Regions:
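Conserved lysine of the Walker
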Residues: 449
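Conserved P-loop NTPase
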Residues: 724-777
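Post-Walker A helix-loop "phosphate-sensing" segment adjacent to the P-loop in P-loop NTPases
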Residues: 459-469
């Protein structure tokens, strides 16, 4: 007899009560605001844990996750009961539409909003409308709520550490969240739920009135409430070997379903004693059998196979407990699922049983109405276990029922980035919830990076009031800027649109010294002027810094707007020969034919939607143009920040900025400023190698919380895998990937996605395929 288990059974035992009302079927007496439920001296609390990408992890990563999950199971105290639950919950489509669809604004952009909304609705109809939520519920036995709170606080700290090792996180549920979970199961997600405990007390109502169905009946093999039919199944037979995909496939049913695994751990000393007693019994049986054979003069008889097997199993079990630090666990698994009709329920039950048979397991129906009720109460994450059906497992065997499958990103206020390639659910990313909103879009030509970027820009234009600024080296974004009534500033050798490279707004820079930061920018420009790529010397830096400071002092004193021409003049005034050399380098760009950045700004850059088209700049000026545009964007971001307005910045062909050290340093500083000034920067490039060849570029990419990776070249794949810790299995999603498919790194998670936009107004604006463009022109 295992004393700890018998003690728990005794504590858990309740008087048999025949429920007289629907409310009586909820085995909870009292609820507390912090999420603790009480029934007698039994206290329970639930924690939600986030899913992780187990299905697409490499073999080595899966093994590490399996070991970490085993550590989690081993951490369960033998004085508590633990329940791990997977809740297949149908999405409330009405509420989901309210969150994701773009409201119409009765302006000339509404046709685009309508098309975008129709696209989203079509994609939603293709996806599964089931979301998996995962919970761990702990049941303890204490004499007071204070003792219970202290214990749950310690458990929460342990869980937080152990789930972090798995790459997941653990969130405590309060009373409203726990009750909503039960409400959604009993009454479906379509009904509104809110909890006001003070209001309940005033009206003399029970919290159970908010969550229970209006009618419930329990039958021999199923139950029903409010027009829904349900059935509880339990796992009655386990194989000797089980694959870790079992739970994932079992919970793939696209219906309301709850899977629960109840676990009670046994202290190792009691477990060893129990196995030793069984081992002694097996040895006694073998000895008795041998003595019987000897009495019959059968001295060479071989011990029967079943006895040898029992002996071997006992020895292995003892070794596992003593040598391999495994723990004995008493487990039972229940599944409850719902359907709209009895026929549908029978069909779904057979589907679940077929999955179990595939893995040489056996799912059986709980017979009798009382058992269906007991099974339902056990399967729900309330914290009770009313089924005396347990199977003895070691930690390793229990860990095979691993509850992880694939990480989902479906956040309120998020932008649509396609569908999860594993679960087919929408991917909705809200960058505001990340530690920083810095982003990159990476992919070879033709992989769909500009198309995806344009989709994001369109969503921001149509659904927010934020400012959008684009640095467009190839003129790719002109069609959407024109269609969305934005402003295009064309900067080129024959253009009359000018941007002053010496413009400086209030609050410029991130060091607190605006002049020093502007000097860094000017140094990056001079590095672009050096055709020998030898860089600028320390003497050059000192001269530039001095002259920039003098130019701004003169400008403030004499009230004029400084330009590169003023800097050119100031360099000529200096006595050092190096200053003359710097002035000569600058001459072509101030008084010569490439002087487009040496004029005062003559264009209005206050438009909400602004694109800098530098397609006609020419190769010699393109990098310089990107730097000047970035500097102008810094000024605009600072102005918006002072007004409390968010800015989204998109910089295409960002890799060219990292071709030399000074421009890379300046841009890294700009990247930091964007984050501090509530700007969301996105860098787009097809040349990952250029980006990673710079220490600044590598740092920016590795510290960015949001990265979209489309199809990559072999070398780029390897570099990204090393930098971002991408597994071989995950790399398969960016190897010869179809257009619009790849991986999204969101915070610490990497999710495979598929994003295909149907042909229409938005597709026509976004496409860069020569065939599609030709058809549009015709």
């Amino acid at each position: 007899m295992i004393k700890s288990y018998e003690r728990l059974k005794k504590l858990n035992k309740e008087k048999t009560r025949v429920p007289r009302t629907v409310q009586d079927t909820i085995p909870v007496d009292t609820i507390y605001k912090d999420g603790i439920f009480r029934s007698g001296n039994k206290y329970t609390k639930s924690y939600r844990f986030l899913d992780i990408n187990y299905k697409i992890a490499s073999g080595e990563d899966k093994n590490n996750l399996f070991l970490s999950y085993s550590d989690l199971l081993n951490s369960f105290d033998s004085s508590v009961m633990t329940k791990i639950t997977i809740n297949n919950r149908k999405v409330d489509i009405k509420r989901f539409k309210e969150d994701i669809l773009i409201p119409l604004k009765q302006d000339n952009l509404d046709p685009y909003r309508e098309e975008y909304n129709n696209m989203l609705l079509d994609k939603l109809s293709e996806s599964d409308d089931i979301v998996q939520e995962k919970y761990i519920t702990v049941t303890i036995f204490k004499s007071s709520i204070e003792e219970a709170r202290f214990t749950f606080s310690r458990i929460a700290t342990e869980f937080s550490t152990l789930f972090a090792r798995l790459g997941s996180s653990c969130i405590e549920l309060n009373a409203e969240e726990r009750l909503k979970m039960l409400h959604d199961f009993y009454r479906s997600e379509t009904e509104e739920f809110s909890l006001d405990m003070n209001d309940l007390a005033k009206k003399g109502h029970s919290f159970k009135d908010l969550i229970t169905p209006r009618m419930s009946k329990y039958h021999n093999k199923y139950f029903e409430f409010d027009g829904k039919f349900g059935r509880v199944l339990y796992l009655s037979n386990y194989p000797g070997f089980l694959k870790d995909e079992f739970v994932s496939e079992l919970c793939d049913l696209n219906k309301n379903l709850m899977y629960s695994m109840d676990i009670i751990t046994i202290p190792t000393d009691e477990a060893v004693r129990e196995v030793e007693n069984k081992f002694l019994g097996v040895e006694k049986n073998i000895t008795d059998w041998q003595m019987k054979q000897n009495r019959n003069n059968n001295f060479s008889a071989i011990i029967p196979y079943d006895m040898e097997l029992q002996r071997k199993e006992c020895k292995e079990f003892l070794d596992d407990l003593i040598v391999r630090d495994q723990r004995m666990m008493l487990c039972n698994i229940t599944v409850v699922h719902l359907a709209d009709s009895l026929e549908e329920l029978d069909k779904d039950s057979e589907t679940l049983k077929a999955v179990a048979r595939k893995y040489v397991c056996e799912l059986e129906t709980l017979y009798f109405s009382k058992r269906q009720l007991d099974g339902l109460q056990t399967a729900l994450p309330i914290g009770v276990n009313k089924l005396n059906i347990t199977r003895t497992l070691l930690t390793e065997s229990a860990a095979v029922f691993i509850p992880f499958r694939a990480h989902e990103i479906m956040q309120k206020g998020g932008i649509w980035y396609g569908q999860n390639a594993i679960t087919n659910n929408p991917i909705l990313c809200n960058k505001a919830l990340l530690q920083n909103p810095n982003s990159f879009v990476l992919g070879i030509p033709g992989s769909g990076k500009s198309f995806l970027t344009k989709e994001e820009i369109e969503f921001l234009i149509l659904s927010t009031n934020d400012d959008i600024i684009i640095a467009d080296p190839e003129g790719e974004y002109d069609p959407i800027i024109k269609a969305m009534k934005g402003q295009i500033i064309r900067i080129g050798t024959n253009s009359k649109d000018y941007i002053n490279a010496m413009d400086m707004s209030e609050g410029y820079g991130d060091s607190g010294n605006a002049i020093a930061d502007k000097s860094q920018f000017i140094m990056s420009l001079f590095e672009q002027l050096d055709t020998n790529h030898g860089g600028i010397s320390p003497i050059d830096r000192s001269i530039i810094d001095r002259c920039v400071s003098l130019v701004y002092q003169d400008a403030m004193k004499n009230n004029f707007i400084p330009t590169l021409k003023h800097l050119y003049g100031k360099l000529l005034e200096q006595s050092e020969p190096e200053a003359k050399s710097l002035a000569i380098k600058l001459e072509l760009f101030t008084n010569g034919s490439l002087n487009i950045f040496a004029h005062e700004t003559n264009v209005d850059i206050k438009s909400r939607i602004l694109s800098f088209n530098i397609f006609n700049l020419g190769k010699q000026l393109k990098t310089m143009g990107l730097l000047v545009i970035t500097d102008a964007i810094i000024n605009r971001v600072n102005e918006n920040w002072r007004k409390g307005k968010r800015t989204h910045v998109f910089i295409d062909e960002i890799h060219v900025i990292f071709e030399n050290e000074e421009s890379a340093t300046f841009f890294a500083s700009a990247w930091r400023q964007f984050r501090k000034r509530d700007a969301y920067p996105t860098g787009i490039t097809q040349n990952v190698k250029y980006l990673l060849s710079s220490q600044q570029g590598t740092s920016m990419l590795s510290n960015s919380e949001f990265i979209v990776m489309l199809n990559q070249s072999a070398n780029d794949r390897e570099d990204l895998a090393r930098l971002l810790n991408i597994s071989e299995e995950q790399m398969g999603y960016i190897t010869n990937a179809p257009t619009g498919s790849g991986l999204i790194k969101y915070g610490g998670s990497i999710v495979p996605f598929v994003n295909k936009m149907p042909k229409g107004l938005l597709y026509d604006l976004n496409t860069t395929k020569p065939g599609d463009r030709k058809l549009l022109i015709n």
